[in-house]
């Protein structure tokens, strides 16, 4: 798969960038941390590097001087105190700058301005779907409405606290099925095979999307993002991580708004979220909020750049947050590999710096060396946070004139120091060293075999109109016939390949651009890694001999043009973040297109880049646990074990010669899946507001809704093939995983052309059935859907493929289990959900051994008896939709189920009291612990679910302030609204480190917080209560950004068989009926003497977690193969107040079960 970034989507645990073929890839080097308060559009997890909790610190792109952004011919200089009548005179048309090229499908208007202090801004007016308004609304009308709305706004933020990473993680437990993209995606390009090889994504992963739909699709927020054209490259040598630390510190109060967490509290109160990221050469801040409060939010946010306080006391506490972030990042192979790669740069190059920062570099070492970190922070801010380095993007349902007035008034106060921006472009060829063209063996944390081949090229940003690396990566990452991966898969040497440049700062900056090819190897592939590398070099040599092909370029260009022309709108906060970075890179006319379109075919530019990809300039990194014992070096910051070897002489000599090409490697054929018909279809049945059931038989049913809102030539097809066979045993669950992964493997080559033509598909091994998801341009979508069903019908596997997939699945299960947060979830759901097979059960069943015959028998039985449920939405007729279901039924020719099957687990009813399940983490090199305190409620109504959402929303800010800001217990701290197979509850989770705290201490502090929170809500004013209710209503009231959000919400109702498509309306109605006493009574009832409380501790390894003999965990530890739960007893103090769970099966065997329950009324 090629690695090219389209529009980035962000998420809680990290950042994933969606690649051209519609799958996901993790961006190497992106330092990130996401707040859980607003779980962005799509859970695209990422690597994490330094960043505030809600911060994503990123090592991002080049920092080139933008072209054409000064005043120029049609440039516009915003003036302080501009004449109001002149401004109003322009407002009636609300027409944007014609120079800025936008998609015909984009209803927004754009205007570029430059303030007198040098700050450049892009104003985005989104007046589409404004009820009762048109694009001709005047500033006066807007301001009048604003004043009226603000009359009842209560500005008491005093009690609301900092929430950099907290936020209500309102996610349904059933949605938490494994391989939900937030929790179980691999954090490494080398490991992306797990995306397809995990079965962890159950059908309730779809429910996770419902949560996100609830939070982000219900309102199109106003949003802003600001990019400072300076990042971690500017870190002083004696204070590593200072740029990242400053990005944290500017949030901590300002001269105008001194409350330390005032901005976060203001956003939280008004349904907003914020984040920030530190990159190599850029630092980005962004937020969104309800439109009504956008102007005030802009003023509060701008103070970060006008006069932040950065008081000494806050510095000491925030260093702990940065250090916790670093500790969380240490077990990531992606981060470890990146740090190792940076260390290969020549001395003096900034890539060799430690961007993260930690307590050692920001506190202890400075103290030892008499460095005043506080003074240096302010000095760094004054030097580098200058207006003329900044690009700002604001988007709201205001006229362009209104936005210009606000931006000019507020952001003109940012100082301009008049100093030139730091420039690193003279530091070229950082990796032109003898150490680069070597073989590096690395011992990873995870179970993985991977080979990464990397070249460091001259900076490529100036070639954005040609995008030579995108052209090359499209071919190298191709998975169809004649491709590298197709050949390696046939040899059973590789499972996945990602090639190209992810456009992060680590991969592309003003000093170099990386081109890398990461290949996930099988066990056999690891043994033949030199042959694998040779295959890559043969393919590249073939491309070099052929030279650039205009046919291929034009095919890529056509695919990109189609996607741009018919693009769907994205979440505003993601969009403005992307645009403010684009403003640093592209001239004004290409702000919206520069990162996506291929403008010019220049074969000489492509050839110049292609001809540098030769073996003599390549760096080889081989990751494998098999390297243990032969790696005698250790990277300073992440402790990565590695060795450096000369490439074997026989291969060196071969690659120097005119070696033969491989006849099995060739260019891809012409793509038959590229859409050419974009006609919008007419209705062939009555229009409905919600999906209607148009087919209902014993074998299946179909829900359908024709799109008449977004009016794009795309469709979404989703099917759930339900079978009772899957959950009958742990072995069956594993066989189902193997089946889905082999099916995905079988489809990889024939379906790849569809994938790159913007037709996306995913097969998900759900808890109760196979989920098929297909979307894209409707013209050729039936071809892809039929291809999937054909391969499902004719499923087969060779012994070699079966062995390859089962071996990889062992690694996948292992990699999931060694993460404390995912093990904690597995333990919690194993306790709560009756008859659930845990990940450890599955791992053990796989280790016990399964045969190909058992798989084929399982698949035969699975296909013989099913119930199929589907949803089709978009630019398709009802007749065409029925054809999809008919095709499934006719091809599979299955019998109906003998009885209706529930698509959820029964849940155990916890006894009253406090129950504690404390287990050791399974990665003995990981200091991270996870503590979750869960309160079970029971079978509740939709009204009570909504009340619980409101409770958690109230809880977010004080939870974060108490547990992270004041107690500094950990980086990730959040309350969560839990829906576990229809049974309600709420929890508070803290990720901490055993090097700093004992898990029981954290548990007690969580209880301390909940006690203080009870007092807080009792003293809540009616105004403060109503403000929060209004904020949640607003989040549920606004329109979807694009069709996919509406589909996600509807699919969640279908896949859980709840069918309450107007759920949001019912929740809004419930919210309007709540009083403060409802909230207080509900909380007290669940915290009282009869409360049902479960604490789950996954205990890391460090000095605060000692075994009974006083030895730290992990010393003289057993082999990593021992994947058993090791229960730990509570301390004598905690034992007095808790009931320990030391055998989950024995504990749950004695408990009653709740009846199956759905939250539908």
UniProtKB/Swiss-Prot annotation:
Tissue: Highly expressed in brain of early postnatal mice but expressed at a lower level in the brains of adult mice. Expression is high in cortical neurons, and lower in neurons in the striatum. Very low expression detected in the corpus callosum. Also expressed in the gray matter in spinal cord and dorsal root ganglia.
Signal peptide range in chain numbering: 1-18
Enzyme Commission number(s) of this protein: 3.4.24.61
Keyword Metal-binding: yes
EC class: hydrolase
GO cellular component, one term: mitochondrion
InterPro entries linked: Metalloenz_LuxS/M16, Pept_M16_N, Pept_M16_Zn_BS, Peptidase_M16, Peptidase_M16_C, Peptidase_M16_M
GO molecular function, one term: metalloendopeptidase activity
Catalytic-site annotation from UniProt: 247 (proton acceptor)
Matching Gene3D superfamilies: Metalloenzyme, LuxS/M16 peptidase-like
Reported cofactor(s): Zn(2+)
Subunit: Interacts with BACE1 and NRG1.
Function: Cleaves peptide substrates on the N-terminus of arginine residues in dibasic pairs. Is a critical activator of BACE1- and ADAM17-mediated pro-neuregulin ectodomain shedding, involved in the positive regulation of axonal maturation and myelination. Required for proper functioning of 2-oxoglutarate dehydrogenase (OGDH).
PANTHER family in the cross-refs: INSULIN-DEGRADING ENZYME-RELATED (PTHR43690:SF18), NARDILYSIN (PTHR43690)
Protein name in UniProt: Nardilysin
């Amino acid at each position: 798969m090629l690695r090219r970034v389209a529009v980035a989507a962000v998420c809680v645990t990290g950042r994933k960038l969606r690649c051209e073929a519609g799958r996901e890839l993790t961006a190497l080097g992106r330092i990130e941390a996401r707040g859980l308060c607003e779980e962005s559009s799509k859970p695209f997890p990422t690597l994490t590097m330094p960043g505030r909790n809600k911060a994503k610190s990123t090592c991002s792109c080049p920092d080139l001087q933008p072209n054409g952004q000064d005043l120029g011919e049609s440039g516009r200089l915003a003036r302080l105190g501009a004449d109001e009548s002149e401004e109003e005179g322009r407002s009636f048309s609300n027409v944007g700058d014609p120079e800025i090229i936008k998609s015909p499908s984009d209803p927004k208007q754009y205007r570029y301005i430059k303030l007198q202090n040098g700050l450049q801004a892009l104003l985005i007016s989104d007046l589409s779907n404004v009820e009762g308004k048109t694009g001709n609304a005047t500033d006066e009308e807007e301001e009048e409405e604003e004043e009226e709305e603000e009359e009842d706004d209560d500005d008491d933020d005093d009690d609301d606290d900092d929430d950099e990473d907290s936020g209500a993680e309102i996610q349904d437990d059933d949605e938490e099925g494994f391989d939900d993209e937030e929790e179980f995606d691999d954090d490494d390009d080398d490991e992306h095979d797990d995306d397809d090889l995990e079965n962890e994504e159950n059908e309730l992963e779809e429910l996770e999307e419902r949560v996100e739909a609830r939070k982000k699709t219900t309102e199109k927020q106003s949003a802003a993002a600001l990019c400072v054209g300076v990042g971690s490259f500017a870190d002083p040598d004696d204070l590593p991580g200072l740029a990242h630390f400053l990005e944290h510190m500017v949030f901590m109060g300002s001269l105008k708004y001194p409350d330390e967490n005032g901005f976060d509290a203001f956003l939280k109160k008004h349904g907003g979220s914020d984040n920030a990221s530190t990159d190599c050469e850029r630092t980005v801040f962004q937020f969104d909020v309800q439109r009504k409060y956008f102007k005030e939010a802009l003023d509060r946010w701008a103070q970060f750049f006008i006069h932040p306080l950065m008081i000494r006391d806050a510095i000491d506490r925030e260093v702990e947050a940065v250090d916790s972030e670093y500790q969380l990042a240490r077990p990531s192979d992606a981060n470890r590999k990146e740090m190792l790669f940076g260390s290969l740069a020549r001395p003096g190059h900034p890539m060799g710096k430690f961007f993260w920062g930690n307590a050692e570099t920001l506190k202890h070492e400075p103290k030892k060396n008499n460095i005043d970190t506080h003074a240096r922070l302010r000095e760094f801010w004054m030097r580098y946070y200058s207006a003329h380095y900044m690009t700002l993007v604001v988007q709201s349902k205001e006229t362009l004139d209104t936005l210009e007035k606000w931006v000019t008034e507020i952001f003109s106060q940012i100082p301009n120091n008049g100093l030139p921006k730091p420039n690193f472009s003279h530091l070229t060829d950082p990796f032109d060293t003898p150490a680069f063209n070597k073989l590096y063996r690395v011992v990873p944390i995870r179970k993985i075999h991977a080979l990464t081949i990397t070249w460091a090229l001259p900076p490529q940003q100036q070639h954005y109109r040609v995008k030579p690396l995108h052209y090359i990566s499209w071919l190298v990452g191709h998975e169809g016939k004649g491709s590298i991966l197709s050949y390696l898969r046939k040899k059973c040497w590789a499972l996945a390949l990602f090639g190209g440049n992810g456009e992060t700062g680590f991969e592309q900056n003003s000093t170099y651009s990386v081109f890398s090819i990461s290949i996930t190897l099988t066990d056999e592939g690891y043994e033949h890694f030199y042959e694998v590398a040779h295959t890559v070099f043969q393919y590249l040599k073939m491309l070099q001999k052929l030279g650039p092909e205009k046919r291929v370029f034009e095919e890529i260009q056509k695919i990109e043009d189609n996607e741009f022309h018919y693009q769907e709108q994205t979440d505003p906060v993601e969009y403005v973040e992307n645009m403010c970075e684009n403003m640093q890179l592209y001239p004004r006319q290409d702000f919206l297109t520069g990162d996506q379109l291929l403008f010019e075919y220049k074969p000489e530019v492509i050839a110049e880049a292609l001809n540098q990809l030769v073996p003599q300039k390549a760096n080889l990194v081989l990751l494998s646990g098999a390297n243990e014992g032969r790696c005698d070096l250790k990277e300073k910051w992440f402790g990565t074990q590695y060795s450096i070897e000369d490439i074997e002489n026989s291969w060196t000599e071969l690659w120097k010669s005119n070696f033969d090409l491989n006849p099995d490697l060739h260019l891809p054929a012409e793509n038959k899946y590229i859409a050419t018909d974009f006609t919008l279809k007419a209705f062939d049945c009555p229009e409905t507001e919600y999906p209607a059931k148009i087919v209902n038989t014993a074998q299946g049913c179909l829900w359908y809704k024709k799109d008449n809102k977004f009016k794009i030539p795309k469709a979404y097809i989703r099917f759930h093939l339900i079978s009772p066979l899957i959950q009958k045993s742990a072995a069956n669950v594993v066989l189902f995983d193997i089946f889905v992964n082999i099916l995905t493997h079988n489809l990889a080559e024939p379906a790849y052309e569809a994938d790159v033509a913007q037709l996306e598909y995913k097969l998900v091994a759900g808890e109760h059935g196979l989920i098929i998801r297909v979307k894209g341009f409707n013209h050729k979508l039936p071809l892809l859907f039929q291809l999937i069903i054909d391969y499902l019908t004719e499923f087969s596997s060779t012994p070699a493929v079966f062995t390859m997939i089962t071996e990889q699945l062992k690694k996948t299960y292992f990699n999931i289990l060694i993460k404390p947060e995912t093990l904690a979830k597995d333990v919690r759901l194993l306790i709560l959900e009756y008859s659930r097979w845990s990940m450890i059960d599955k791992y053990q069943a796989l280790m016990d051994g399964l045969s190909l015959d058992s798989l084929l028998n399982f698949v035969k039985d699975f296909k013989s008896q099913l119930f199929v449920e589907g949803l089709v939405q978009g630019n398709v007729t009802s007749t065409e939709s029925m054809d999809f279901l008919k095709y499934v039924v006719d091809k599979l020719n299955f019998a109906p189920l003998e009885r209706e099957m529930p698509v959820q687990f029964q849940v155990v009813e916890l006894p009253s009291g406090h129950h504690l399940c404390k287990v050791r983490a399974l990665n003995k090199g990981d200091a991270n612990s996870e503590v979750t305190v869960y309160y079970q409620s029971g079978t509740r109504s939709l009204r009570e679910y909504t009340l619980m959402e409101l409770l958690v929303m109230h809880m977010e800010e004080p939870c974060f302030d108490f547990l992270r800001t004041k107690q500094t217990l950990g980086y990730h701290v959040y309350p969560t609204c839990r829906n576990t197979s229809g049974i309600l509850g709420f929890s508070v989770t803290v990720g901490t480190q055993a090097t700093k705290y004992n898990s029981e201490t954290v548990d007690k502090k969580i209880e301390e917080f909940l006690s203080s929170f009870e007092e807080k809500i009792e003293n809540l004013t009616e105004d403060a209560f109503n403000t929060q209710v209004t904020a949640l209503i607003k989040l549920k009231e606004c329109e979807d950004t694009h069709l996919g959000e509406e589909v996600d919400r509807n699919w969640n109702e279908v896949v859980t068989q709840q069918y309450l498509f107007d759920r949001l309306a019912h929740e809004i109605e419930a919210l309007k009926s709540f009083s403060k006493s409802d909230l207080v009574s509900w909380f007290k009832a669940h915290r009282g003497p009869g409360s049902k409380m479960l604490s789950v501790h996954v205990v890391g390894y460090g000095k605060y977690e000692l075994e009974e003999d006083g030895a730290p965990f992990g010393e003289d530890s057993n082999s990593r193969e021992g994947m058993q739960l090791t229960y730990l007893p509570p301390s004598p103090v905690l034992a007095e107040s808790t009931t320990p769970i030391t055998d989950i099966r024995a504990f749950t065997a004695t408990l009653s079960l709740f009846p199956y329950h759905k939250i539908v009324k």
